[in-house]
From Swiss-Prot:
Effect of residue 719 to Q: Found in a family with nevoid basal cell carcinoma syndrome; uncertain significance; does not inhibit cell growth when overexpressed in vitro
Glycosylation sites: 370, 812
Database matches in Gene3D superfamilies: Multidrug efflux transporter AcrB transmembrane domain
Organism placement in taxonomy: Eukaryota, Metazoa, Chordata, Craniata, Vertebrata
Cytoplasmic side: 1-57, 414-428, 479-501, 553-686, 985-991, 1035-1064, 1115-1203
Entry protein name: Protein patched homolog 2
Gene: PTCH2
Extracellular compartment segments: 79-392, 450-457, 523-531, 708-963, 1013, 1086-1093
Residue ranges annotated for the SSD domain, each copy included: 394-552
GO MF terms, alphabetically ordered: hedgehog family protein binding; hedgehog receptor activity; smoothened binding
Keyword vocabulary terms for this entry: Disease variant, Glycoprotein, Membrane, Receptor, Transmembrane, Transmembrane helix
Length: 1203
């Protein structure tokens, strides 16, 4: 009966599979997986030897190629347009956005500049004359902003958006209106006379002071001008718009103001107004009918009494609307003010941006620091500036991160022996990876992949951390060359042993990022593609160029030159330790501290029944260790930390050695072999590990339920900035979004009026839609159009009843009556367009509230030309735009009676306001309701879709989790296939995928506890975590697969040889990520640094703790099985002929099995641990008992131990 030895006494038997399997392959009975891997390793061996022979050429050509690609960075384009970054590619939103731009152009109708005022003391009522006075001070300061560009002065009145400027036939009135027509400013000050102070226009009439909105009474002005001009049309226009006395009829906020007009209700009483009462129900612009600002647009944090009366509010908001760059360009094109500056749309955009920046600056400085109120200002340019700042590469962080990596790589590869130190290799490796990252990004720029914030802020650090992992792995393996390896084959032997791991991890990383590109968000798709390309470039650099660097360093070490200062010889080169041969008995060989060479006879046979290859080692070799070095200058370092990369001595009998400090005896390999693996692989430790990881998985599953969808703009903007304060106040108090319901072409609007009204009603009934006041009609073009027709129909009926309009004349009727006359006689027939008999037999709007289809498009032409304020208020944005048609009541020619019909509409929209959207779930609910309303309308033949920022940026969440699960599942399948193909072992690939799936679930759950919301960016990190996790698992799995012995023994050896590279890789990744923690953007810190740091720590724990335990329990059987017997039957074994592997077969073999006699020179390093380590190895061999001392080993020989 056999018993297992203590894990502290585990023997070394980690050997490259290709070398171990060589005799068996030629014996013709090895399984295909090992044969294929051996073939692949042979290719890597040839590649390494070729690079070593031509290392100078490879290094020169590699640096030249990477440097040329890095120059492509000069062509990099940084994208900051939110629509281009976040709208899903190929989605219905993308198609709808394309349709909108195709019909209306690129620019929106206007841009918004906002002021939000809050009290410094939270919860304080802001509805007081004093608070509104401070708001007036800030708004007035902002409205007076002027910028000088191109030799011109630009103020608000020149660049603001003006809604529906009417066309007036009277030239004097037209010029006066052009100068006086007010800007659209949505402000609570419009409830008071002080709102007029924000309007900067003025006009001059002889005998009067300058006319401004602060002293303009339109009714009084019309009375004064009436005797001198025909103003009937203008008067009707003002009456329809319900202008009244404009601002001078409103109460004064400060009745003691010397300019407070006498017509103000509180001018004589001198009493301050009841602010809450005046603001209740909202405010109006100069037109009471078309310019109504609802409470929700002006006030935030409102509180009401039980009767619904407004009592208090905590925030005020004013919004200034400016023209778009295209509108500003068109407005001043050909104007005398811009004829000498080469006016262009780019100049118009520059003017607007300069004004907006100045607006924000002055508004924020308008109130003193000790004021009881605070002003937050924001503009569309501010958002662009934030995105530009967010996308800029921080040179300090990049340089800092790379310097940390350089320092770590250099220190971890230094050694006390100056000639054997590899600090220069570490420096060169990090610099090479940095060049590879730059070349990968340059290649992305050459391929036209745009850069964004994720590229510039994260990718340089992430790619560096990933790329340096393989540098450590290669450098570590290069110094662990098997004794007896010819100098010219060192690089080939290194790639032969580690190339498979590098290929596997790189391919999985590239596959991970390519799978992450399935997320259809342009910014993240670009990031994923760039990451895949950068990983590919670092893979090429590590596999081709870095071996050339190692080969050059090998020459330096062989010549005993100093590290870094390679022109000087090492001072340690004169210290030579001569290892003298010893007089040994038969079969006894000397054992060195660093490695052991023994010559043994091995007999290999294949049993036909089991198809197993069996190697038999006779107990004829005795291993005698010499006295150890008391100062420990020759350290045992089988697979330790990269700071011990040169722990193995060159295979020469004379070698240089510098004495190291006693503390240098400890290293990661020593820790893994003597402390970590024995502790981890004990039965009770395995149980504890499984329980703890099971608990972590269960806790993560609970955390996954806490993850919410969303990404607020406040997460992107740096905390503590004025922009963040504004966005926080806006999100808290004014969560309103302007949206539109767009109707497309492809159906007949004239015959679908009922369906259009039903669509509007369904949309208006959504929970998130802000309803209009009960006293106001819906604000849509179809309602305005119908109401206008009903108004002129009523005027016609009145004129007809009074006889002012007859069958043959309308000149004595009103303007509206004349318009109705012309519409009523239209037939829509090109042959007979007029029919006067219809004057009394038809109506412009029938009893059901529908417009006769034959009049629909002709009436649309008349309405658009005659009611500009109503058209502007409706925000219809018709395409194709109806033709212009001028009405002249006194022109009775037949041509004037003909009304050209508008072309069939292909684009129109109903505006809405969405409120109460705080969480992503609120947005998703509103989007789903809007989509359902459009789907129902589609069944009625109306083609419509919703438009606006909620649908642009939040619709992705409808299918984000589905995309995430799809990408992760596809990636896990791809990882399984790649691992199974390269490892040629589905069993091992399945365990790797199991661990990776656990890592993804746990990362997702920890995100929930950290408060990280699920958006496209965390999805990319989660998907990429599968590929990055391969870095921590595949090395251990491959080491387990290619060693011999029991599962526990193989797991221990896998840990022994991979603990240090995996740990160094994790540290390198963490150092690369460390600089992200210093970002000014909280978004970078939380969503990238925190998430990727957690991912790295999870990978370290799963790769070095959980996976070895799983492998020791569920791992696959060894690929190479060796059995050792006390007295093997030897049939004329051939005599050894030097080192290496030699084999031959006996001429007389039994039919049951074939014997192959092998004479092998076995390189056993590091030195054997106390205890016997040659033991029987069945398919899952038991552990042999341990000996108590190294002397037992030499006395007993390597025979099996039985208990």
């Amino acid at each position: 009966m056999t018993r297992s030895p203590p894990l502290r006494e585990l023997p070394p038997s980690y050997t490259p599979p290709a070398r171990t399997a060589a005799p068996q392959i030629l014996a013709g009975s090895l399984k295909a997986p090992l044969w294929l891997r051996a073939y692949f390793q042979g290719l890597l061996f040839s590649l390494g030897c070729g690079i070593q022979r031509h290392c100078g050429k490879v290094l020169f050509l590699g640096l030249l190629a990477f440097g040329a690609l890095a120059l492509g960075l000069r062509m990099a384009i940084i994208e900051t347009n939110l629509e281009q970054l976040w709208v899903e590619v190929g989605s219905r939103v993308s198609q709808e956005l394309h349709y909108t731009k195709e019909k209306l152009g690129e620019e929106a109708a206007y841009t918004s500049q906002m002021l939000i005022q809050t009290a410094r003391q939270e919860g304080e009522n802001i509805l007081t004359p004093e608070a509104l006075g401070l708001h007036l001070q800030a708004a007035l300061t902002a409205s007076k902003v002027q910028v000088s560009l191109y030799g011109k002065s630009w103020d608000l009145n020149k660049i603001c958006y003006k809604s529906g400027v009417p066309l007036i036939e009277n030239g004097m009135i037209e010029r006066m209106i052009e100068k006086l027509f007010p800007c659209v400013i949505l402000t609570p000050l419009d409830c008071f006379w002080e709102g007029a102070k924000l309007q900067g226009g003025s006009a001059y009439l002889p005998g009067r002071p300058d006319i401004q909105w602060t002293n303009l009474d339109p009714e009084q002005l019309l009375e004064e001008l009436g005797p001198f001009a025909s103003l009937e049309g203008f008067r009707e226009l003002l009456d329809k718009a319900q202008v009244g006395q404009a601002y001078v009829g409103r109460p004064c906020l400060h009745p003691d103001d010397l300019h407070c007009p006498p017509s103000a209700p509180n001018h004589h009483s001198r009493q301050a107004p009841n602010v809450a009462h005046e603001l209740s129900g909202g405010c109006h612009g100069f037109s009471h009918k078309f310019m109504h600002w609802q409470e929700e647009l002006l006030l935030g944090g409102m509180a009401r009494d039980p009767q619904g009366e407004l009592l208090r509010a905590e925030a005020l908001q004013s919004t200034f609307l400016l023209m778009s760059p295209r509108q500003l360009y068109e407005h001043f094109r050909g104007d005398y003010q811009t004829h000498d500056i080469g006016w262009s749309e780019e100049q118009a955009s520059t003017v607007l941006q300069a004004w907006q920046r100045r607006f924000v600056q002055l508004a924020q400085e308008a109130l003193p620091e000790n004021a009881s109120q605070q002003i937050h200002a924001f503009s569309s340019t501010t958002l662009d500036d934030i995105l530009h700042a967010f996308s800029e590469v921080s040179a300090a962080r990049v340089v800092g991160g790379y310097l940390l990596m350089l320092a770590y790589a250099c220190v971890t590869m230094l050694r006390w022996d100056c000639a054997q130190s590899q600090g220069s290799v570490g420096l060169a490796g990090v610099l090479l990876v940095a060049l590879a990252v730059a070349s990968g990004l340059g290649l992305c720029a050459l391929l036209g992949i745009t850069f964004n914030a994720a590229t510039t802020q994260v990718l340089p650090f992430l790619a560096l951390g990933i790329g340096v992992d393989d540098v450590f792995l290669l450098a570590h393996a290069f110094t662990e060359a098997l004794p007896g390896t010819p100098l010219q084959e060192r690089m080939g032997e290194c790639l032969q042993r580690t190339g498979t791991s590098v290929v596997l991890t790189s391919i999985n990383n590239m596959a991970a990022f390519l799978m992450a590109a399935l997320v259809p968000i342009p910014a993240l798709r670009a990031f994923s593609l760039q990451a895949a390309i950068v990983v590919g470039c670092t893979f090429v650099a590590v596999m081709l160029v870095f071996p050339a660097i190692l080969s050059l360093d090998l020459r330096r070490r062989h010549c005993q030159r100093l590290d870094v200062l390679c022109c000087f010889s090492s001072p340690c080169s004169a210290q030579v330790i001569q290892i003298l041969p010893q007089e040994l008995g038969d079969g006894t060989v000397p054992v060195g501290i660093a490695h052991l060479t023994a010559t043994v006879q091995a007999f290999t046979h294949c049993e036909a029944s089991s198809q197993h290859v069996v190697t038999i080692l006779p107990p004829q070799a005795h291993l005698v260790p010499p006295p150890s070095d008391p100062l420990g200058s020759e350290l045992f370092s089988p697979g330790g930390s990269t700071r011990d990369l040169l722990g193995q001595e060159e295979e020469t009998r004379q070698k240089a050695a510098c004495k190291s400090l006693p503390c240098a005896r400890w290293n990661l390999a020593h820790f893994a072999r003597y402390q970590f693996a024995p502790l981890l692989l004990q039965s009770h430790a395995k149980a504890i590990v499984l329980v703890l990881f099971g608990a972590l998985l269960g806790l993560s599953l609970y955390g996954a339920t806490l993850v919410q969808d969303g990404l607020a703009l406040t997460d992107v903007v740096p905390r503590g900035t004025k922009e963040h304060a504004f966005l926080s106040a806006q999100l808290r108090y004014f969560s309103l979004y302007e949206v539109a319901l767009v109707t497309q072409g492809g159906f007949d609007y004239a015959h679908s009026q009922r369906a259009l009204f039903d669509l509007h009603q369904r949309f208006s009934s959504l929970k998130a839609v802000l309803p209009p006041p009960a006293t106001q009609a819906p604000r849509t073009w179809l309602h305005y159009y119908r109401n206008w027709l009903q108004g002129i129909q009523a005027a016609f009926d009145q004129d007809w009843a009074s006889g002012r309009i007859t069958r043959h004349s309308y000149r004595n009727g009103s303007e509206d009556g004349a318009l109705a006359y012309k519409l009523l006689i239209q037939t829509g027939d090109a042959q007979e367009p007029l029919d006067f008999s219809q004057l009394t037999t038809r109506k412009l709007v029938d009893r059901e509230g529908l417009i006769p289809p034959e009049l629909f498009y002709m009436g649309l032409t008349v309405w658009v030309s005659s009611d500009p304020l109503g058209l502007a208020a409706s925000q219809a944005n018709f395409y194709p735009p109806p033709p212009e048609w001028l009405h002249d009541k006194y022109d009775t020619t037949g041509e004037n009676l003909r009304i050209p019909p508008a072309q069939p509409l292909e684009f129109a929209q109903f505006p809405f306001l969405l409120r109460g959207l705080q969480k992503t779930a609120d947005f998703v609910e509103a989007i789903e309701g809007a989509r359902a309303a459009c789907a129902e309308a589609g069944q009625a033949g109306v083609h419509a879709y919703p438009s606006g920022s909620p649908f642009l940026f939040w619709e992705q969440y409808l299918g984000l989790r589905r995309c995430f699960l799809l990408a992760v599942c596809i990636l896990l399948v791809c990882t399984f296939l790649v691992c199974a193909l390269l490892l040629l072992n589905p069993w091992t690939a399945g365990l790797i995928v199991l661990v990776l799936a656990m890592m993804t679930v746990e990362l997702f759950g920890i995100m929930g506890f950290l408060g990280i919301k699920l958006s496209a960016i965390p999805v990319v990190i989660l998907v990429a975590s599968v590929g990055i996790g391969v870095e921590f698992t595949v090395h251990v799995a491959l080491g387990f697969l290619t060693t011999q012995g029991s599962r526990n023994l193989r797991a221990a050896h896998a840990l022994e040889h991979t603990f240090a590279p995996v740990t160094d890789g994790a540290i390198s990744t963490l150092l690369g990520l460390l600089m992200l923690a210093g970002s000014h953007f909280d978004f970078i810190v939380r969503y990238f640094f925190a998430a990727l740091t957690v991912l790295t720590l999870l990978g370290l724990l799963h790769g070095l703790v959980l996976l070895p335990v799983l492998l020791s329990i569920l791992g696959p059987p060894p690929e190479v099985i060796q059995m050792y017997k006390e007295s093997p039957e030897i049939l004329s074994p051939p005599a050894p002929q030097g080192g290496g592997l030699r084999w031959g077969a006996s001429s007389s073999l039994p039919q049951s099995f074939a014997r192959v006699t092998t004479s092998m020179t076995v390189a056993i390093h590091p030195p054997p641990l106390p205890g016997a380590y040659i033991h029987p190895a069945p398919d899952e061999p038991p552990w042999s008992p341990a000996a108590t001392s190294s002397g037992n080993l030499s006395s007993r020989g390597p025979g099996p131990a039985t208990g």
